[in-house]
Each structure stands twice: as structure tokens, then as C-alpha cells.
């Protein structure tokens, strides 16, 4: 950090602001400010403290501590914070494999309530669904297994959502656009590695109390982070408690047409209102013991997340056109659910001469339960339901993993003396990493479905089991050929065996697959002392089918009774044990220019050639759970595909580009995507759910002479049309999300932040059209979006 004092004239308005700041600071801290000195005042809540090395001695408390500066004096000091962002950019610049690093300062900037809200502003990241209702993050517009999400280098369990993590728990986020042997090759679109906060010797005790307001609902939350050290032990503990409340509404219009004549045979309109309440708690920690002065460290990492939800939905169905009356006119449903996820990881690092051994093992388990009752009524039947569906499910999964990694430095610097290449390696030295990963998991699902008291799906039993075992071996070498060139080469082999109950109730099938993935990354600097560099990556990656797609028990569409038929746009769902993994050959080419004070300009081109593409296909089948044929959606390998794109990013301070401009921090990125699925007619035969583009432009500025910081961001994703097959077409609407925040720093220990998300809400309308057997069915789904406000008080206790 660079602190440059600059006296300013003191006005009456300034004195009033400082008096208010002093009063609130005294009330919240008991009058005991913790400033170290007049010059080196602590950073405001928006700028996190920089961690100290674990082995660094903690400075002793002086007998006569320096008296804190008065607010009037402190306000006259000009504080310039450049270290945080420069550190993130330096990590990015020194990485041989292309990597974007987002640190604490950037994560904290907007004061988001969940990590998912932070991710959607990052370069190349999109989220499906309406604003504020999105699902898991996607890189390059590709989700559903194309984007690998890691937490501390470990894959997240099925059913886990990044929405369950708070920004206070995260130290940094790394986005790897191409896979590496160490992080894994199940990353065709890339990898998002979420690094949780580590323990360091500077004491922290932060409390953040906030409330969210949306569509007439209130959602409070509390987050607490504590960090300290005792002797050889450093630890960090983060906890949060939240209560979420959302109200949604939607309209679904379904129209059946005769393809030949164009006549409308049936039209139905369903309107629904949903009230969802969720309460949860999240606790995570990291405890590190330094076992010796040689760098031996033992780290324990427990995490626990628990949430309960209550969802109530009312709906009505009208049929303006149609000869056969609908099955119901109105109805309601109530779902009571809970999810608990716990994990315990143990990591041991030991120096072995010139090598470092790292052993990492963990056990984890998650439990989920859900109980739903749906009742349907007709006008003629009055208050007596014509159909009642009671569905209960209990799912549990246990997992265990053991990883070993050995890092070794080989070779020696040239005789002329050591020099550093473009990456982290010293010229002439090799950073060799070898590792092994073993993971085993077992899932058990118990489910019962009653329709008017009669059990459904009796052929499949109440209990379904599946297990999966994964073994991976890898080796990678990073070395600098000379001050201009650095190379990162790796080879990874991974095998997965899955066994479980089949979707059709037959004997337990087994699915085995293994993949060898060579990976090569290179970086070249035209001038060893310059700020420009060029990156090239040649990779092989893959996407494995998950347990749900392989072994899933049939899921009956609740809108259509099992005794009758359903429609192509409302199919039942089942698994396919014969799926093969998708394979992809990829190339990435990037040009980067690093600016002063942590700025960066970059352009990246990428291409992925995919073989054995997996896609959900809907067909009319004879099924065991119904006396008539029903439409069933199963995931199938349908052929090959190609996706390409360009990604642009610019991050800089405005006064460094325009003389005399204010010190505004600017951030912008633009990504353009194009894809083509072979065997599917064009022109919109793109990969499922891949948008044409995504863009962000944002800025933040601390108003000089005031404790006020303002910032904003605009996220844009255009609408697009997707030809899924010869018969099916979907359209996805565009999104334009405006966010803005204001931070008032009352004192170094107190801040008040206000965030507005989706300031210009728009309706979200998607369509799904399927044409089979001379009949065209089109479904139009519309749901409004809402502005969300967050108000949060940030305290450094």
C-alpha cells in the first residue's frame, strides 16, 4: 500500500461528516479505535488486509500505543491502495497456463450476498435463467458439466450450489481457460477454482449484518469472519446465517397446431404464484499447524452447510381452445425440503530435500430430503381434489478421496547466473509435479410417489443405489527455456467406473470409461523486461456423464397423470447407462499487455472440437410405468460439435489513459461465441444454452474529500435461438442487468454499503417448440424479474 498525505481545506460540511463518523465509530467500538498510526491507517472495509506469511512473527503490542488520529486529521490523509489488485494481476502474469485471478478487493467490491452474484460479473461467465434466479455459473456459455467448479482444488459434490457460499468465505477466485494436468481435464469450457480464506497471523474479527429487499419480501443475513494465531497455529473461521424469502410468478402458454392446415387444436394457459422461504447456516474453517521451521504444515479444513426450505405454489389453468376439457382448473402444491452437506479435509505438506510432498485426504457426505403434496381441482368438483400426488424422497451420498502430489525442482541455472523466465520458473530449472487421485462415492435414493393413494413406479422399488470410483494419475513440468519462453507440459490419465440401478428397473449395469489427456501451454515475451506476452495452449479435455444421467430413476411429469399420455414439451425423464464421455480437442491463443498499477488488456481466441456430444432427446416410448405410450427425455450421444470464440478484457484506471480524468477504476470484458452441432440442421444448431455473447462494463470511484465510494456494472447477454434437433427449437431471451453500489466509510472500522441489483427489471420469456407426427406444440414461458436491494453494515471488531 502507498500512503501519500495530501492536506485538504476543511469545510463546514466536512466537519459535520467527520463528527457523524466519530459518533458512530464510538458507539460501535466503545471508543477504542485500532489505528496503528496517523500515516498507516487501516484500510476501509472495502479494501481487505493483506495476509502475512504464516511463519512471520507477530509484532508485539507496544507498551504505549500510538493515539489514534482524530477524524479531522485522518480525513486529510490521502490513501492510495494499489497492492491488492496488483498482486492479483502479478499472479496472472506469472502463470504459464492462462489464468485470471480475482482477489479479496474485487470480491468485496459490490457487497454481494452470495458468491453466485460475484461470479456473473467475471469475464466470460454467464448464468442461466432470469436475473437473480440463475443456476450454476458457466464459462463460455457452456454449463452442465462443461465448466469444472472446484473448491480449494477439489470438485464440488452433486447438488452443491455456489449460492450457498458467501463472499466472506472466499480468499480468491481463479478462472483457468484451459485445463492443466493438476486441476483436471473435465473442463472443456474451463475451470473456476474457488479458494477459501486461509489463516494468517494478522488478527481479523469482521462482522457484517445485512438485509435484502425484493418484491415486498425481506431477507436478513449475518456473516462473521475471525482470524488469529496462537503459537504454531493459525486459523480462520467463517460463519453465516441467512433467511431468504422470494415471491415469484410465471405464465406458461401451450398451443397445439396442425402442421398441414395451421389450425389451432388446443391452447392452455397456466398461471402460477410461488412463495419460497429458505433458512440456512454455513460454517467453514481452516486450521494450520506449522510442524517445523522447514515448512512442514498440517492443515485441517472442516465445512458444514445446512438449509431448510418451504415452498408453496398455487396455479390455475384455462383452456380457451380445445374439444377435450383440461384435467384440472386450479391447484396448489407444498414442498418441505432440507439439505445438509458436510466435509472434512486434512492436508499435510512436508519438505523432502529439494522436493515437497503434499498429501490431501477427505471425507464428505450430504443428505437431502423433500416432501411434496400436489392437489388439483376442477370447477365441477369444488373443494374436493380430483387428483392428489404425494411425493417423498430421501437421498444421501458419501464420498472419500485421497490425493498425493510431489513437487520437485530439477536442473540448475545457467553459468551466467539465475534469471527468471516469463512464468514462475527460473531459466534452466524444471518444476516437476506428479500426482495421484483416488475418489469413491456411493449414493442411495429412497423415493415413493402416491397418486390418489396408489403407489406409482412400483416396478423400480423404493431404494436405488449407485456408486462411482475414480482414479487419476498425472505429471506436469513447467520450465523456462530462456527469458523469453516458458513451457508447461502435462499428461493426465483418468478412469471412472459407475455401477447402479438402471432406469428401466433391470439388472445393475456398469459404465466404465478412461481418458488420457495430453496438455501443453506456452508463453512468449517479445521483450523479457516488457509488459507484453503471448500465450498458446493445446489441450485435450472431456466431459463425463454424471450419475443422474446414467442411472436416474424415472421422473414423472406431475402435470400429466401417469394413466394417460403427456406432451413432447412436458416429458417424463429417465437415465441412459450406455452414455459415452464427450472428448474435446482445444486450442487457445491469447495476447496480453499489463499496465501500471495492476491494469491489463487481453484478447483470447479459443476453439474446441467435441466428439460424442451428449444431449437430451425426447421420444415417444412404450414405458412400464404407464398403460399408454409417453414422451420420455433421455440423454444420448448424438454426434460431434465445434465451438469457437473470442474474449476481450480491459482493466485500468481512467486517469492513466486520459490526462486529467478522475481516478475511476474501469473494468470491461466482451466475449463472442459461435458453435455448430453436426447432424442438426442450421442456422442455429448451436450447443445447448450457449449464448452468442456476453459483456460487462463497470466502474467505481471514491469521491475525493468524502468517505463515499460509488460503483456500478452493466451485464449484457443477447437473446438467441437454438435448433436442438430436426424437430425441436428453443429461444432464450436476452438479459441486461444493471447493478450499482454505494459505500460510506464512517471510520476505519465501520462502513455502510447499499447495493441495487437488476435496477432495470424486464420480463424473461422463453419458448420451446417441438414438431412430431404432423403436430406442432409450442410452449411460451414468461416470468417477471425484480430489483433486489441489499443494505449491509460492515464492522471490524
Which residues make up each language-model segment?
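Face-selective signature of the C-terminal outer-membrane beta-barrel domain
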Residues: 284-307, 334-502, 525, 529, ...
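N-terminal periplasmic "start-of-domain" segments of outer-membrane beta-barrel proteins
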Residues: 77-110, 136-138, 144-147, 200
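C-terminal beta-signal and adjacent terminal beta-strands/loops
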Residues: 4, 716-722, 743-797
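Short acidic/polar hinge/loop motifs at secondary-structure boundaries
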Residues: 138, 154-180, 224
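Extracytoplasmic beta-strand/coil segments of soluble accessory domains associated
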Residues: 99, 116-154
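N-terminal periplasmic accessory domains that precede
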Residues: 115-118, 135-138, 175, 187-209, ...
Amino acid at each position: 500500500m502507498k500512503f501519500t498525505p495530501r492536506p485538504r481545506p476543511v469545510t463546514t460540511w466536512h466537519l459535520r461528516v467527520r463528527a457523524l463518523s466519530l459518533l458512530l465509530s464510538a458507539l460501535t467500538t466503545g471508543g477504542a479505535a485500532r489505528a496503528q498510526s496517523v500515516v498507516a491507517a487501516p484500510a476501509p472495509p472495502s479494501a481487505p488486509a493483506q495476509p502475512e506469511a504464516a511463519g512471520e512473527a507477530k509484532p508485539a503490542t507496544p507498551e504505549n500505543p500510538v493515539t489514534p488520529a482524530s477524524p479531522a486529521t485522518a480525513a486529510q490523509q490521502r490513501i492510495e491502495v494499489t497492492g491488492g489488485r496488483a498482486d492479483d494481476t502479478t499472479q496472472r502474469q506469472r502463470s504459464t497456463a492462462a489464468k485470471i485471478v480475482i482477489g479479496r478487493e474485487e470480491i468485496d467490491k459490490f457487497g454481494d450476498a452470495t458468491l453466485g452474484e460475484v461470479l456473473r460479473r467475471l469475464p466470460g461467465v454467464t448464468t442461466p435463467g432470469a436475473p437473480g434466479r440463475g443456476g450454476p455459473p458457466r464459462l463460455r456459455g457452456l454449463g452442465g458439466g462443461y465448466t469444472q467448479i472446484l473448491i480449494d482444488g477439489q470438485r464440488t459434490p452433486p447438488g452443491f450450489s455456489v449460492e450457498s457460499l458467501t463472499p466472506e468465505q472466499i480468499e480468491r477466485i481463479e478462472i483457468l481457460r484451459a485445463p492443466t494436468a493438476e486441476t483436471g481435464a473435465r473442463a472443456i469450457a474451463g475451470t473456476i477454482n474457488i479458494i477459501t480464506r486461509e489463516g494468517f497471523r494478522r488478527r481479523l474479527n469482521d462482522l457484517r449484518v445485512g438485509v435484502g429487499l425484493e418484491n415486498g419480501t425481506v431477507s436478513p443475513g449475518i456473516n462473521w469472519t475471525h482470524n488469529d494465531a496462537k503459537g504454531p497455529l493459525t486459523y480462520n473461521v467463517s460463519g453465516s446465517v441467512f433467511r431468504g424469502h422470494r415471491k415469484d410468478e410465471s405464465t406458461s402458454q401451450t398451443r397445439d397446431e396442425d402442421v398441414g392446415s395451421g389450425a389451432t387444436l388446443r391452447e392452455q394457459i397456466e398461471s402460477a404464484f410461488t412463495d419460497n422461504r429458505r433458512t440456512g447456516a454455513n460454517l467453514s474453517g481452516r486450521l494450520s499447524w506449522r510442524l517445523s521451521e522447514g515448512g512442514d504444515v498440517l492443515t485441517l479444513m472442516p465445512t458444514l452447510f445446512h438449509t431448510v426450505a418451504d415452498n408453496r405454489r398455487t396455479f390455475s389453468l384455462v383452456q380457451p381452445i380445445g374439444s377435450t376439457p383440461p384435467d384440472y382448473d386450479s391447484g396448489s402444491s407444498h414442498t418441505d425440503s432440507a439439505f445438509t452437506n458436510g466435509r472434512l479435509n486434512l492436508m499435510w505438506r512436508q519438505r523432502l530435500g529439494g522436493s515437497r510432498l503434499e498429501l490431501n485426504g477427505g471425507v464428505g457426505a450430504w443428505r437431502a430430503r423433500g416432501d411434496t403434496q400436489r392437489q388439483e381441482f376442477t370447477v365441477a368438483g369444488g373443494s374436493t381434489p380430483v387428483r392428489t400426488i404425494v411425493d417423498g424422497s430421501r437421498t444421501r451420498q458419501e464420498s472419500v478421496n485421497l490425493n498425493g502430489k510431489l513437487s520437485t525442482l530439477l536442473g540448475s541455472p545457467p553459468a551466467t547466473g539465475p534469471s527468471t523466465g516469463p512464468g514462475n520458473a527460473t531459466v534452466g530449472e524444471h518444476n516437476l509435479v506428479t500426482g495421484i487421485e483416488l475418489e469413491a462415492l456411493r449414493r442411495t435414493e429412497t423415493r415413493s410417489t402416491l397418486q390418489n393413494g396408489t403407489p406409482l413406479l412400483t416396478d423400480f422399488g423404493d431404494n436405488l443405489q449407485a456408486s462411482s470410483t475414480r482414479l487419476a494419475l498425472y505429471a506436469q513440468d513447467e520450465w523456462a527455456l530462456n527469458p523469453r519462453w516458458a513451457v508447461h507440459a502435462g499428461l493426465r490419465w483418468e478412469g471412472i467406473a459407475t455401477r447402479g440401478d438402471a432406469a428401466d428397473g433391470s439388472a445393475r449395469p456398469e459404465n466404465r470409461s478412461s481418458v488420457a489427456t495430453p496438455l501443453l501451454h506456452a508463453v512468449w515475451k517479445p521483450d523479457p523486461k516488457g509488459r507484453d506476452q503471448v500465450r498458446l495452449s493445446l489441450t485435450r479435455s472431456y466431459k463425463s456423464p454424471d450419475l443422474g444421467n446414467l442411472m436416474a430413476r424415472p421422473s414423472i411429469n406431475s402435470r400429466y397423470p401417469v394413466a394417460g399420455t403427456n406432451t413432447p414439451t412436458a416429458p417424463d425423464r429417465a437415465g441412459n447407462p450406455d452414455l459415452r464421455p464427450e472428448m474435446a480437442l482445444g486450442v487457445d491463443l491469447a495476447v496480453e499487455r499489463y499496465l501500471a498499477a495492476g491494469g491489463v488488456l487481453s484478447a483470447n481466441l479459443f476453439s474446441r472440437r467435441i466428439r460424442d456430444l451428449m444431449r437430451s432427446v425426447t421420444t415417444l416410448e412404450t414405458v412400464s410405468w404407464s398403460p399408454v405410450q409417453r414422451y420420455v427425455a433421455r440423454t444420448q450421444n448424438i454426434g460431434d460439435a465445434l465451438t469457437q470464440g473470442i474474449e476481450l478484457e480491459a482493466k485500468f484506471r481512467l486517469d492513466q489513459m486520459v490526462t486529467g480524468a478522475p481516478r475511476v477504476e474501469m473494468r470491461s470484458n466482451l466475449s463472442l461465441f459461435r458453435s455448430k452441432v453436426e447432424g442438426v440442421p442450421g442456422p442455429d444448431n448451436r450447443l445447448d444454452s450457449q449464448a452468442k455473447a456476453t459483456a460487462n462494463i463497470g466502474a467505481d470511484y471514491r469521491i475525493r474529500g468524502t468517505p463515499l465510494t460509488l460503483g456500478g456494472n452493466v451485464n449484457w447477454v443477447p437473446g438467441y435461438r437454438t435448433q436442438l434437433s430436426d424437430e425441436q427449437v428453443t429461444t432464450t431471451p436476452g438479459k441486461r442487468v444493471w447493478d450499482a453500489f454505494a459505500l460510506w466509510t464512517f471510520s476505519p472500522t465501520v462502513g455502510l454499503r447499499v447495493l441495487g441489483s437488476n435496477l432495470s427489471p424486464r420480463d424473461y420469456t422463453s419458448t420451446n417448440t417441438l414438431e412430431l407426427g404432423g403436430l406442432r406444440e409450442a410452449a411460451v414461458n414468461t416470468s417477471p424479474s425484480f430489483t433486489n436491494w441489499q443494505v449491509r453494515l460492515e464492522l471490524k471488531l
